[in-house]
């Protein structure tokens, strides 16, 4: 009885294998209709008997390439309209299937089942030839707001360089576009909040000489998150960005904020002075002025802010506002001191005169900032309210109504 059951089992297995083989044969017979062929071969990709045959994956990739070629041709025909979703999806599937074919084929070569690979060269040539078209797919998806597909296409472009079939392709590895499109993969990953992908592609993309700053910014955002962030990595990335892209204000601003928060103003001044030695931009001057302000070196800070004003470039309104701060905030220290004194205390009146004197100095600078940037109330609004309250109640009432 056992022998009979065993024989039946063998017959059933043989029939099942035969059925899967016939699926592959059917798919081959439909190669002139690639979409039908692609659908027909799908069961063979999951069945252990046929899924372990590199030819199955080669055929699946060929069908996807044929679908891609048909859609791509429409782009070049007068009045032709291609289905771009189908176009790029078939390209991505072709990549997946050819790479799987190579993986299985190489395993059989290493085990001795095959003497040498049959499909590697042809697959590699196809992948390399069509590789740039992945960028088109990524750009198309990104512009549509489909960041998942954008990440898929840009990621494939970058990842394929490290596939075993390209292990000896030094030209491909040296392609500067790898880092460029790793930047775009990073941007897409950042939009998806896919931290792992940001870190993976960001560390490649940061090496691009022109666009690498984008990858570093995304890395900084990822490491700077309150939950799951890494403050040490954040600082490392910000420092790297400052060194590699000193003209990008994002990194300079962040590193200076860090120095101020940590009480490391001297370190910040040393770094900003190095940057100013190479390029005296309004932003670098502004940062230096703020650092001097933080050290309470108000006269030196005012001199720097006046330089920004005399250059008449960017940040002029901000410079006027910061000069106002150099008088307003020292006055606030005296205001706090007076709050602890009795009104009949001789020191109280002396302090009141000092407060008014400092407010009088600050007033024209805040008013100039208001004139230059009336919509940016953070530069002048509350400061002028405080000053007018002390110096001129009519102006206070008018400004209070204006501010709402």
Regions found by a protein language model. Name each.
Residues 65-148, 152-179, 329-365:
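Short coil/linker segments at helix-helix boundaries
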Residues 31, 67, 144, 192, ...:
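Structural motif corresponding to the intra-repeat A-B loop/turn of tetratricopeptide repeats
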Residues 1-26, 241, 403-404:
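Bacterial Sec-dependent N-terminal signal peptides
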Residues 43-54, 100-127, 159-176, 207-208, ...:
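Flexible helix-coil transition and linker loops at the boundaries of alpha-helical arrays
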Residues 20-86:
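Start-of-domain marker
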Residues 60, 67, 130, 137, ...:
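Structural register within alpha-helical repeat arrays
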């Amino acid at each position: 009885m056992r022998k009979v059951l065993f024989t039946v089992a063998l017959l059933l297995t043989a029939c099942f294998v035969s059925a899967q083989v016939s699926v592959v044969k059917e798919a081959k017979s439909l190669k002139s209709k690639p979409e039908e062929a692609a659908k027909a071969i799908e069961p063979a990709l999951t069945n252990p008997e046929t899924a372990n045959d590199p030819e199955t994956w080669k055929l699946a990739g060929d069908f996807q390439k044929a679908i891609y070629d048909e859609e791509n041709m429409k782009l070049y025909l007068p009045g032709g309209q291609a289905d771009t979703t189908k176009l790029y999806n078939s390209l991505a599937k072709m990549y997946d299937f050819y790479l799987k074919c190579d993986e299985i084929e190489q395993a059989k070569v290493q085990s001795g089942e095959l003497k040498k690979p049959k499909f590697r060269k042809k697959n590699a040539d196809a992948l390399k030839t069509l590789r740039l078209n992945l960028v088109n797919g990524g750009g198309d998806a990104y512009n549509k707001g489909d960041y998942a597909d954008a990440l898929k296409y840009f990621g494939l472009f970058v990842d394929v360089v490290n596939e075993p079939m390209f292990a000896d392709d030094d030209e491909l590895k040296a392609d500067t576009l790898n880092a460029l499109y790793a930047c775009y993969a990073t941007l897409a990953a950042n939009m998806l909040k896919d931290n792992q992908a940001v870190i993976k592609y960001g560390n490649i993309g940061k090496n691009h000489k022109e666009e690498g700053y984008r990858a570093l910014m995304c890395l900084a955002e990822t490491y700077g998150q309150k939950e799951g962030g890494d403050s040490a990595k954040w600082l490392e990335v910000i420092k790297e960005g400052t060194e590699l892209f000193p003209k990008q204000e994002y990194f300079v601003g962040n590193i200076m904020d860090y120095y101020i928060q940590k009480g490391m103003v001297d370190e910040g001044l040393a770094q900003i002075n190095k940057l100013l030695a190479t390029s005296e931009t309004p932003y670098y001057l502004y940062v230096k002025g703020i650092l001097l302000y933080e050290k309470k070196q108000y006269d030196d800070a005012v001199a720097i802010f006046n330089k920004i004003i005399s250059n008449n470039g960017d940040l002029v309104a901000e410079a006027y506002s910061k000069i106002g701060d150099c008088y307003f905030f020292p006055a606030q220290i005296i205001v706090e001191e007076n709050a602890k004194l009795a009104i009949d205390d001789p020191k109280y009146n002396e302090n009141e005169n000092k407060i008014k004197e400092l407010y009088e100095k600050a007033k024209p600078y805040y008013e100039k900032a208001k004139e230059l940037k009336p919509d940016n109330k953070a530069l002048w609004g509350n400061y002028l309210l405080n000053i007018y309250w002390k110096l001129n109640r009519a102006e206070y009432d008018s400004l209070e109504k204006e501010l709402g």
